[in-house]
Amino acid sequence: LALCSILTCLVFVLMSSCVSHGSAGLDPTAEDKLLKAPVAPGYSFAFSTPRSQWQAGTMPHIYQIDPAWSELPYAGGTIRQNACGPTCLTMVYIYKTGHTDMTPVDMCALSEAGNYAPTGATEWSFMTSGAWQLGLNGTELHIDRSSITQALRSGAPIIASVRPGTFTNVGHYIVLWGIDGADQVGVYDPNSQSRSARRWGVVEVLNEIEAMWAYY
Protein backbone atom coordinates (compact mmCIF):
# COMPACT_ATOMS: atom_id res chain seq x y z
CA LEU A 1 0.00 0.00 0.00
CA ALA A 2 2.84 2.35 0.92
CA LEU A 3 4.58 1.60 -2.38
CA CYS A 4 1.39 2.35 -4.32
CA SER A 5 1.03 5.68 -2.53
CA ILE A 6 4.60 6.64 -3.37
CA LEU A 7 4.12 5.73 -7.04
CA THR A 8 0.88 7.73 -7.16
CA CYS A 9 2.67 10.80 -5.76
CA LEU A 10 5.49 10.46 -8.28
CA VAL A 11 3.03 10.31 -11.19
CA PHE A 12 1.24 13.42 -9.87
CA VAL A 13 4.50 15.35 -9.55
CA LEU A 14 5.59 14.41 -13.08
CA MET A 15 2.24 15.44 -14.54
CA SER A 16 2.36 18.76 -12.70
CA SER A 17 5.87 19.37 -13.98
CA CYS A 18 4.82 18.78 -17.59
CA VAL A 19 1.87 21.14 -17.30
CA SER A 20 3.89 23.96 -15.75
CA HIS A 21 6.64 23.76 -18.37
CA GLY A 22 4.16 23.66 -21.24
CA SER A 23 2.24 26.72 -20.10
CA ALA A 24 5.42 28.80 -19.89
CA GLY A 25 6.20 28.53 -23.61
CA LEU A 26 4.51 29.45 -26.90
CA ASP A 27 3.11 27.00 -29.37
CA PRO A 28 4.51 27.41 -32.90
CA THR A 29 1.44 29.30 -34.14
CA ALA A 30 1.51 31.80 -31.28
CA GLU A 31 5.26 32.26 -31.65
CA ASP A 32 4.90 32.92 -35.38
CA LYS A 33 2.26 35.58 -34.69
CA LEU A 34 4.50 37.23 -32.10
CA LEU A 35 7.48 37.43 -34.45
CA LYS A 36 5.31 39.01 -37.15
CA ALA A 37 3.80 41.59 -34.80
CA PRO A 38 4.86 45.26 -34.99
CA VAL A 39 7.83 46.02 -32.76
CA ALA A 40 7.09 48.54 -30.03
CA PRO A 41 9.37 51.58 -29.63
CA GLY A 42 12.27 51.02 -27.27
CA TYR A 43 12.72 47.32 -28.00
CA SER A 44 16.20 46.10 -28.79
CA PHE A 45 15.20 44.56 -32.12
CA ALA A 46 13.25 45.61 -35.18
CA PHE A 47 12.26 44.04 -38.47
CA SER A 48 13.50 45.61 -41.70
CA THR A 49 11.47 46.38 -44.79
CA PRO A 50 11.03 42.99 -46.56
CA ARG A 51 13.35 42.41 -49.49
CA SER A 52 10.31 41.92 -51.75
CA GLN A 53 9.50 45.62 -51.20
CA TRP A 54 12.96 47.01 -51.98
CA GLN A 55 12.86 49.28 -55.01
CA ALA A 56 14.67 52.26 -56.47
CA GLY A 57 13.36 55.61 -55.32
CA THR A 58 11.89 54.29 -52.08
CA MET A 59 13.99 54.40 -48.92
CA PRO A 60 13.66 51.14 -46.98
CA HIS A 61 13.99 50.81 -43.24
CA ILE A 62 16.94 48.47 -42.69
CA TYR A 63 18.00 47.79 -39.11
CA GLN A 64 21.28 46.49 -37.75
CA ILE A 65 19.18 45.12 -34.87
CA ASP A 66 17.09 42.95 -37.20
CA PRO A 67 17.22 39.36 -35.85
CA ALA A 68 17.92 38.13 -39.39
CA TRP A 69 21.54 39.27 -39.04
CA SER A 70 22.03 41.23 -35.80
CA GLU A 71 24.20 38.61 -34.09
CA LEU A 72 26.45 37.85 -37.06
CA PRO A 73 30.08 38.99 -36.71
CA TYR A 74 31.41 42.33 -37.87
CA ALA A 75 34.52 44.31 -36.95
CA GLY A 76 35.37 42.35 -33.82
CA GLY A 77 31.80 42.41 -32.53
CA THR A 78 28.40 41.88 -34.09
CA ILE A 79 26.31 43.65 -36.68
CA ARG A 80 24.07 44.80 -33.84
CA GLN A 81 27.01 46.44 -32.08
CA ASN A 82 29.14 47.82 -34.90
CA ALA A 83 27.40 47.87 -38.27
CA CYS A 84 25.47 51.15 -38.33
CA GLY A 85 27.66 52.38 -41.20
CA PRO A 86 27.26 49.37 -43.50
CA THR A 87 23.54 49.25 -42.71
CA CYS A 88 23.13 52.89 -43.72
CA LEU A 89 24.99 52.30 -46.96
CA THR A 90 22.72 49.30 -47.59
CA MET A 91 19.68 51.57 -47.39
CA VAL A 92 21.18 54.11 -49.78
CA TYR A 93 22.30 51.38 -52.19
CA ILE A 94 18.78 49.95 -52.34
CA TYR A 95 17.26 53.42 -52.80
CA LYS A 96 19.65 54.36 -55.61
CA THR A 97 19.76 51.07 -57.52
CA GLY A 98 16.69 49.03 -56.61
CA HIS A 99 18.96 46.00 -56.40
CA THR A 100 18.29 43.32 -53.80
CA ASP A 101 21.70 41.67 -53.76
CA MET A 102 23.20 43.57 -50.79
CA THR A 103 22.02 43.11 -47.21
CA PRO A 104 23.90 44.44 -44.17
CA VAL A 105 25.70 41.09 -44.11
CA ASP A 106 27.05 41.63 -47.62
CA MET A 107 27.87 45.28 -46.93
CA CYS A 108 29.81 44.28 -43.81
CA ALA A 109 31.77 41.77 -45.88
CA LEU A 110 32.64 44.54 -48.35
CA SER A 111 33.77 46.77 -45.49
CA GLU A 112 35.95 44.12 -43.90
CA ALA A 113 37.47 43.11 -47.23
CA GLY A 114 38.62 46.71 -47.67
CA ASN A 115 39.75 47.03 -44.04
CA TYR A 116 37.31 49.88 -43.42
CA ALA A 117 36.67 48.90 -39.79
CA PRO A 118 40.04 47.99 -38.25
CA THR A 119 39.13 49.23 -34.76
CA GLY A 120 35.47 48.18 -34.60
CA ALA A 121 34.08 51.45 -35.96
CA THR A 122 33.44 51.88 -39.68
CA GLU A 123 35.69 54.61 -41.07
CA TRP A 124 34.28 57.62 -42.90
CA SER A 125 36.14 56.63 -46.07
CA PHE A 126 33.74 53.72 -46.50
CA MET A 127 31.01 56.22 -47.33
CA THR A 128 32.96 57.39 -50.38
CA SER A 129 35.53 54.76 -51.41
CA GLY A 130 33.37 51.83 -50.34
CA ALA A 131 30.32 53.36 -52.00
CA TRP A 132 32.30 53.90 -55.20
CA GLN A 133 32.85 50.12 -55.42
CA LEU A 134 29.07 49.80 -55.63
CA GLY A 135 28.72 52.45 -58.31
CA LEU A 136 27.58 55.13 -55.86
CA ASN A 137 28.99 58.64 -55.78
CA GLY A 138 29.24 59.87 -52.19
CA THR A 139 29.95 63.61 -51.99
CA GLU A 140 30.98 65.07 -48.65
CA LEU A 141 28.91 68.11 -47.69
CA HIS A 142 29.64 71.17 -45.60
CA ILE A 143 27.90 70.93 -42.25
CA ASP A 144 25.41 73.75 -42.65
CA ARG A 145 21.69 74.18 -43.14
CA SER A 146 21.95 75.18 -46.78
CA SER A 147 23.93 72.09 -47.77
CA ILE A 148 21.60 69.65 -46.07
CA THR A 149 18.38 71.22 -47.33
CA GLN A 150 19.61 71.60 -50.92
CA ALA A 151 20.73 67.98 -51.08
CA LEU A 152 17.49 66.64 -49.63
CA ARG A 153 15.30 68.85 -51.81
CA SER A 154 17.14 67.52 -54.86
CA GLY A 155 16.08 64.01 -53.84
CA ALA A 156 19.53 62.89 -52.72
CA PRO A 157 19.77 60.79 -49.57
CA ILE A 158 22.40 61.70 -46.99
CA ILE A 159 24.43 59.50 -44.68
CA ALA A 160 25.45 61.40 -41.56
CA SER A 161 28.01 60.53 -38.92
CA VAL A 162 26.65 61.82 -35.62
CA ARG A 163 28.48 62.53 -32.37
CA PRO A 164 27.37 61.37 -28.91
CA GLY A 165 24.08 63.04 -28.07
CA THR A 166 20.52 62.45 -29.21
CA PHE A 167 21.18 59.43 -31.42
CA THR A 168 24.06 57.69 -29.66
CA ASN A 169 26.30 57.52 -26.62
CA VAL A 170 29.46 56.85 -28.62
CA GLY A 171 29.18 57.58 -32.35
CA HIS A 172 26.71 56.51 -35.00
CA TYR A 173 25.59 56.72 -38.63
CA ILE A 174 22.06 57.59 -39.76
CA VAL A 175 20.38 58.17 -43.12
CA LEU A 176 18.52 61.39 -43.87
CA TRP A 177 15.99 61.40 -46.68
CA GLY A 178 13.03 63.58 -47.54
CA ILE A 179 12.26 67.11 -46.39
CA ASP A 180 8.96 68.98 -46.18
CA GLY A 181 8.04 72.66 -46.38
CA ALA A 182 8.61 73.11 -42.66
CA ASP A 183 12.18 71.78 -42.97
CA GLN A 184 11.29 68.55 -41.18
CA VAL A 185 13.43 65.65 -42.38
CA GLY A 186 13.08 61.90 -42.35
CA VAL A 187 15.63 60.02 -40.24
CA TYR A 188 16.36 56.37 -40.96
CA ASP A 189 18.20 55.19 -37.86
CA PRO A 190 19.53 51.63 -38.28
CA ASN A 191 19.52 51.18 -34.51
CA SER A 192 16.08 52.53 -33.59
CA GLN A 193 12.60 52.04 -34.93
CA SER A 194 11.21 54.76 -32.69
CA ARG A 195 13.66 57.44 -33.87
CA SER A 196 12.94 56.40 -37.45
CA ALA A 197 9.19 56.79 -36.96
CA ARG A 198 9.13 60.57 -36.49
CA ARG A 199 10.20 63.69 -38.38
CA TRP A 200 13.11 65.81 -37.19
CA GLY A 201 13.87 69.50 -37.57
CA VAL A 202 16.87 70.29 -39.78
CA VAL A 203 18.61 72.29 -37.04
CA GLU A 204 17.86 69.57 -34.49
CA VAL A 205 19.67 67.01 -36.63
CA LEU A 206 22.38 69.38 -37.85
CA ASN A 207 23.55 69.98 -34.28
CA GLU A 208 24.42 66.27 -33.99
CA ILE A 209 26.38 65.85 -37.22
CA GLU A 210 30.17 65.45 -37.49
CA ALA A 211 30.30 64.60 -41.20
CA MET A 212 27.81 63.86 -43.97
CA TRP A 213 27.71 62.63 -47.54
CA ALA A 214 25.05 63.06 -50.23
CA TYR A 215 24.42 60.47 -52.95
CA TYR A 216 23.27 62.14 -56.17
Predicted features and spans:
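Conserved active-site-adjacent core of cysteine acyl-enzyme catalytic domains
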Residues: 19-29, 94, 99-216
